[in-house]
A protein has these predicted regions:
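Conserved strand-loop elements at the edges of beta-sheets that form or border functional pockets
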Residues: 3-6, 23, 222-224, 253
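Long, charged amphipathic alpha-helices with heptad-repeat/coiled-coil character
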Residues: 74-218
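Surface-exposed patches in structured soluble domains
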Residues: 216, 223-258
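Alpha-helical transmembrane helix bundles of large polytopic membrane transport and channel proteins
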Residues: 49-81, 88
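Short, compositionally biased
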Residues: 29-42
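Short helix C-cap/helix-to-loop transition motifs enriched in small/turn-promoting residues
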Residues: 9-11, 39-57
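Short hydrophobic beta/alpha edge segments that flank linear recognition/processing sites
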Residues: 10-31, 242-257
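Acidic, glycine-anchored pre-beta loop/turn
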Residues: 3-16, 37, 137, 236-242
Length: 258
């Protein structure tokens, strides 16, 4: 017992404090539970924002007694800072992959333009070969010229085919990069959901403990259940221990016969 506020034969009113119990242990346990719960609630708010793609952290309902405390403000500041850092990191990571895809697409467009130019040259060569073959058959041109044109045409065909292979390989790289981006996004989401599930389970456990601690704190103050006169006081020593089954005192309503 921390303090005894009444003596034998005192008159008391309903709700008046009779005895105060030492709450050192209970209050320490409550503060410890409260601190852990605050950290978990702030963490949950961050994870929900990350899961939903939000920009701000919002605390869940049901813990208003903790919402406006300095400890909660500090915890939210910490989690908001972490949220911004993780958000920026993911944005940078995804933008790097997006930029890689854009660069590869630009390479494909360049190769496609080269291919179109080579195909135009190939078409012109076909026409020129036909014309020179006609001249050769008439004896007006050398066959050497025709052979040179055909070698050039073969070179163009090889270049066009090589570009086609390069385009196909680059398209594969684009697909791989897109899959990498999707995989990283899925991995990030799975990690967020796993951490969120674990955090919410811990909140459920600690919330029960916190409510139990608050209930114990309320019972540190023993009040008069009704108005009357105090008799049979058995609690006399500050620092003494109360046994649950032992009465501390009796209160007899005024006017009742003892």
């Amino acid at each position: 017992m921390k303090a005894i506020h009444v003596s034998e034969a005192d008159s008391v009113t309903q709700g008046q404090v009779l005895i105060s119990l030492d709450g050192t242990v209970v209050e320490a346990a409550t503060r410890a539970t409260e601190s852990q719960l605050i950290d978990l609630l702030a963490t949950e708010a961050r994870l929900v924002a990350e899961r939903d793609g939000g920009n701000t952290l919002t605390l869940r309902h049901g813990f208003s007694v903790l919402h406006d405390t300095p400890q909660m403000s500090s915890a939210l500041d910490l989690q908001t800072s972490l949220f911004r850092t993780r958000q920026a990191s993911w944005k940078t990571q995804s933008e790097i992959l997006d930029q890689r895809i854009r660069q590869l697409q630009a390479q494909i467009e360049g190769m496609q333009r080269q291919t179109a130019a080579l195909e135009d040259q190939h078409s012109l060569l076909d026409d020129e070969i036909v014309r020179f073959e006609a001249l050769v058959s008439q004896g007006n041109a050398s066959v050497v010229r025709v052979l040179a044109l055909k070698r050039e045409r073969a070179r163009l065909v090889g270049a066009i085919q090589s570009l086609g292979s390069d385009i196909a390989a680059t398209q594969v790289r684009i697909g791989e990069t897109r899959n990498e981006l999707i995989g990283l996004s899925q991995q990030r989401t799975e990690q967020i959901l796993s951490h969120l599930t674990e955090t919410q389970k811990n909140i459920d456990v600690l919330s029960e403990q916190f409510n139990a601690d608050l209930d114990r704190q309320k019972r540190l103050v023993i009040r008069a259940p009704r108005s009357g006169r105090v008799i049979g006081v058995r609690a006399h020593t500050v620092g003494g221990v109360i046994v649950a089954s032992d009465p501390l005192m009796f209160i007899v309503p005024e006017g009742d016969r003892l």
